[in-house]
């Protein structure tokens, strides 16, 4: 706020100028009417006025509020009549000013600080005393050593002198006496030095203990004084708390007094029942009522000095009356709801809801999630009124809180290159970009959506390169939805192929104009006219023939017709009048996403509206986050990206799904809430859409256990490849073998993936990714089948072979020989023995046989004996005679035929 003069301030606060000047003067500020007043001077004046009027002591430090609530309590009385009892409930609540709490906290901190300082001082004193004791000991030891050294020197000198005297004197006895005297003198000197040292040590220790005791007594006195001061200060607060506790006890006594009438009524009724029973059955032993027993127990506890609440049972009569007719309710149903929650809203048992659903043809459990439409039908069937609720109000509010008032400007067209596999889409784009991208694609085919921004002489164009393989249908559809113009590439030597037709269908479904590029016109067998004729069958008619589609003949190898193609694209964009808001919050679509090992989740976003800046908060499907970094298609860091510009963004919470809308929002907290709501909604809707266990398909569910399953853990480098491969593998499933993808994701193969594959007996497929060291260790120890691929054809073919190996084998009976019965003989060992001539193939003894009579099978069994002459033989070939005994069959007649066959296993394929 700008500074004001005294006169202006007086007008603003509504006081006379003279009075305001006097107040400034009282506050120690000399001001006249025209002087300027600063914020600091205003604050000083305000503090002076507060002190003058006693504002510091005006507000209370503690306030107690008392509340009385009056009501009535209906209790049963004598004769079955209810009696109204007036009751009053008193409550009190004490509020303490924040300054009191702050002062107590500051006081506590000061006490703790003083205690720490005292402890520190005591430790320092103890350390000093210990150091002094050590110094005294060292000094005493040094003095004793010095004294002993001097005495030793003196003794040595005296000993030498005595030795000289002894040498001179012939008296040996005098020398010995002198030596003993020296020895005693040495010992006396040592004892005196030791006694002196001990005395000095004891004196130093005594001084240290006295000093520590004095410090401890001083600290105890200070703490006692502090406790007395706190007791004096908190005496009022403790009194208020005691008063509040007393009032609470008084309230409990009032409640007990109010319930006294209930207890007395119960006792009166029980006494009446006892008197009636006594009149009917005679004398009955007197029995105390529960109220009397409770009263005696309470009195006994009161005598012991203990206070306890006694809970007495109320009347056994139910207060609930069954409704005379069904109650129709107004219920609110969200987008998904469980059967149990729906039953709770309708106030019925869940079993009743399940019965109604079974009558309507659907089976459900109590915890099963059902959709909004099903819940509405069930509730209306049971007679309730249903209100449908939208749960995405927060999401709509967040997405509508955007800048949309800016003017629209022209933008570059977004062009998608589509066509059949290996028709030259990426090579055509390479020539335009002057970069060799096709060589970087595995197998020479595009397996990702590549987004590129190209600046030409006539304007800028953004290209999206889509795959042509059949497995990448979703990626092509995604590219068509995010584009303005579709360039349909058709090889002049190959013509219209299945993916060409599919690309036309995607473009027409998205309502996008098509520009046809007839590629490979430089080949000798190129036939552009045939391509034009074939495309007319799919409503793609050249302008030369009266249609709306431009046809351009190009060669991605030589560059022929490239400029004409770019001019055709720019001409088509001018017709469309493309525009976008540039100075606004950005929005776009996720073209591709992946998990980078060093950078985390990376999403390729095509900006469609506004400008995306580094640091913006992006809501993208189930994920959200702040844009930490942005890179263009060449890997260069950029700070902003306008409309029709593809960028890679880093900073999302997870890998978004390709095709999700990316929107810049204002609040990161709300973005997180919307993302979590979308995740929960997706999970509930997925559960609600699962196939319901209806009565008519129960038998089909019973036979599912016979189907073999191939468990697969799939990891790829980008999200689009995961979707395409998973869709292709699911399409390989048959009635006998099913592909079950138990785990899929973006990024390298981790230890978790390997553990999952080991637990579920699955194979691990890696598409342009590799396993880390920990995962390889588990794969080797568990003998898991791990395979790497870089081309989708190889992956699908090998999975198909693995599924073929899981098919149940097929068995076929193959006839290997035929013998005609010429005569029948009798044998005591075998019974009837047929004398036969082998007419076809070979008759083998261990093979099963059939007996035919008039070309009709009359018996099926096995041979018991096969002989030629009298020798047992393993087989008899065509043109030879033999004797055949059929096991457990004696009705063989001449003219019968014995057919020999074997069962052959045939391996099946998908």
From Swiss-Prot:
GTP binds at residues 419-426, 465-469, 519-522. It holds the Pfam family IF2_assoc. One of the essential components for the initiation of protein synthesis. Protects formylmethionyl-tRNA from spontaneous hydrolysis and promotes its binding to the 30S ribosomal subunits. Also involved in the hydrolysis of GTP during the formation of the 70S ribosomal complex. Its main location: cytoplasm. It is found in: Cytoplasm. Residues 555-557 are annotated as: G5. Residues 519-522 are annotated as: G4. Residues 51-62, 81-91, 99-158, 165-250, 261-276, 289-300 have a biased composition (Basic and acidic residues). Residues 410-577 form the tr-type G domain. GO terms for molecular function: GTP binding; GTPase activity; guanosine tetraphosphate binding; translation initiation factor activity. One of its GO terms (cellular component) is cytosol. Residues 465-468 are annotated as: G3. HAMAP family: IF_2_B. Residues 444-448 are annotated as: G2. Residues 277-288, 301-310 have a biased composition (Basic residues). The keyword Plastid does not apply. It comes from the Bacteria. Residues 51-322 are annotated as: Disordered. The lineage of its organism: Bacteria, Pseudomonadati, Pseudomonadota, Gammaproteobacteria, Aeromonadales. The keyword Plastid does not apply. Disulfide bonds: none annotated. This is Translation initiation factor IF-2. Residues 419-426 are annotated as: G1. Belongs to the TRAFAC class translation factor GTPase superfamily. Classic translation factor GTPase family. IF-2 subfamily. Keywords: Cytoplasm, GTP-binding, Initiation factor, Nucleotide-binding, Protein biosynthesis.
């Amino acid at each position: 706020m700008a500074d004001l003069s005294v006169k202006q301030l007086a007008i603003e606060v509504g006081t006379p100028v003279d009075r305001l000047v006097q107040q400034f003067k009282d506050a120690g500020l000399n001001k006249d009417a025209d002087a300027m007043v600063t914020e600091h001077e205003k604050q000083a004046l305000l503090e002076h006025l507060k002190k003058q009027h006693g504002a510091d002591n005006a507000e209370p430090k503690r306030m107690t509020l008392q509340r009385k609530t009056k009501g009535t309590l209906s209790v049963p009385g004598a004769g079955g009549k209810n009696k109204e009892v007036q009751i009053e409930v008193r409550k009190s609540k004490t509020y303490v000013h924040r300054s009191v709490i702050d002062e107590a906290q500051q006081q506590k901190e000061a006490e703790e600080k003083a205690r720490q300082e005292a402890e520190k001082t005591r430790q320092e004193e103890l350390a000093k005393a210990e150091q002094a004791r050590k110094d005294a000991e060292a000094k005493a030891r040094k003095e004793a050593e010095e004294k002993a050294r001097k005495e030793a020197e003196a003794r040595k000198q005296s000993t030498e002198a005595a030795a000289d005297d002894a040498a001179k004197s012939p008296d040996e006895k005098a020398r010995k006496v002198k030596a003993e005297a020296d020895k005693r003198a040495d010992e006396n000197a040592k004892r005196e030095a030791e006694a002196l040292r001990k005395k000095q040590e004891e004196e130093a220790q005594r001084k240290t203990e006295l000093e520590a005791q004095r410090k401890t007594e001083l600290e105890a006195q200070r703490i006692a004084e502090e406790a007395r001061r706190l007791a004096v200060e908190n005496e009022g607060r403790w009194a208020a708390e005691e008063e509040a506790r007393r009032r609470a006890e008084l309230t409990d006594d009032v409640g007990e007094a109010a319930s006294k009438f209930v207890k007395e009524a119960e006792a009166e009724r029980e006494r009446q029942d006892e008197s009636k029973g006594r009149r009917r059955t005679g004398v009955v032993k007197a029995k105390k009522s529960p109220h009397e027993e409770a009263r005696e127990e309470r009195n006994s506890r009161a005598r012991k000095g203990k206070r306890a609440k006694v809970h007495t049972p109320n009347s056994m009569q139910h207060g609930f009356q069954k409704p005379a007719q069904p109650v129709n309710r107004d219920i609110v149903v969200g987008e998904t709801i469980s059967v149990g929650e729906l039953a709770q809203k309708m106030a019925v048992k869940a079993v009743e809801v399940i019965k109604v659903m079974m009558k309507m043809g659907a089976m459900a459990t109590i915890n099963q999630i059902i959709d909004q439409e099903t819940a509405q039908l069930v509730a209306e069937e049971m007679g309730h009124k249903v209100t449908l609720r939208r749960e995405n109000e927060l999401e709509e509010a967040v997405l509508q809180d955007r800048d949309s008032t800016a003017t629209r400007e022209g933008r570059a067209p977004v062009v998608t290159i589509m066509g059949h596999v290996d028709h030259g889409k990426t090579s055509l784009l390479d020539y335009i970009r002057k970069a060799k991208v096709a060589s970087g694609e595995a197998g020479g085919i595009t397996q990702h959506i590549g987004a590129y921004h190209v600046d030409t002489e006539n304007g800028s164009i953004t290209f999206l390169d889509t795959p042509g393989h059949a497995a990448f249908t979703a990626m092509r559809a995604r590219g068509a939805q995010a584009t303005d113009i579709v360039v349909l590439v058709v090889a002049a030597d190959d013509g219209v192929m299945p993916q060409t037709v599919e690309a036309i269908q995607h473009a027409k479904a998205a309502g996008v104009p098509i520009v046809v590029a007839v590629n490979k016109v430089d080949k000798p067998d190129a036939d552009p006219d045939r391509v034009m004729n074939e495309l007319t069958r799919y409503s793609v008619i050249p302008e030369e023939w009266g249609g709306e589609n431009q046809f351009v003949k190009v060669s991605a190898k030589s560059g022929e017709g490239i400029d004409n193609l770019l001019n055709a694209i720019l001409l088509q964009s001018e017709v469309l009048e493309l525009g976008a808001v540039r100075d606004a919050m950005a929005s776009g679509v996720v073209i591709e996403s992946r998990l980078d090992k060093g950078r985390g989740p990376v999403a390729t976003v095509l900006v469609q509206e506004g400008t995306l800046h580094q640091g913006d908060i992006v809501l993208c499907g189930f994920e959200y986050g702040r844009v930490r970094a942005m890179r263009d298609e060449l890997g260069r860091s950029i700070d902003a990206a306008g409309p029709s510009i593809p960028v890679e963004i880093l900073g999302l919470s997870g890998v978004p799904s390709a095709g999700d809308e990316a929107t810049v929002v204002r609040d990161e907290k709300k973005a997180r809430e919307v993302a979590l709501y979308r995740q929960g909604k997706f999970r509930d809707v997925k559960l609600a859409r699962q196939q319901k266990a209806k009565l008519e398909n129960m038998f089909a569910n019973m036979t599912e256990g016979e189907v073999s399953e191939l468990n697969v853990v799939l990891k790829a480098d980008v999200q689009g490849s995961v979707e395409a491969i998973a869709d292709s593998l699911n399409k390989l499933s048959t009635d006998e073998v099913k592909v079950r993808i138990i785990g899929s994701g973006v990024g390298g193969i981790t230890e978790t993936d390997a553990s999952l594959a080991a637990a579920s007996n699955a194979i691990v497929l890696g598409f342009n990714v590799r396993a880390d060291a920990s995962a390889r260790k588990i794969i080797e120890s568990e003998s898991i089948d791990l395979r790497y691929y870089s081309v989708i054809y190889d992956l699908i073919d090998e999975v198909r072979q693995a599924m073929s190996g899981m098919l149940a084998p097929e068995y076929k009976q193959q006839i290997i020989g035929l013998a005609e019965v010429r005569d029948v003989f009798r044998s005591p060992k075998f019974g009837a023995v047929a004398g036969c001539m082998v007419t076809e193939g070979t008759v083998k003894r261990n093979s099963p046989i059939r007996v035919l009579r008039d070309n009709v099978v009359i018996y099926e069994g096995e041979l018991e004996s096969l002989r030629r002459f009298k020798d047992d033989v393993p087989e008899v070939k065509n043109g030879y005679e033999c004797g055949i005994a059929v096991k457990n069959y004696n009705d063989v007649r001449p003219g019968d035929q014995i057919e020999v066959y074997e069962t052959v296993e045939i391996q099946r394929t998908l």
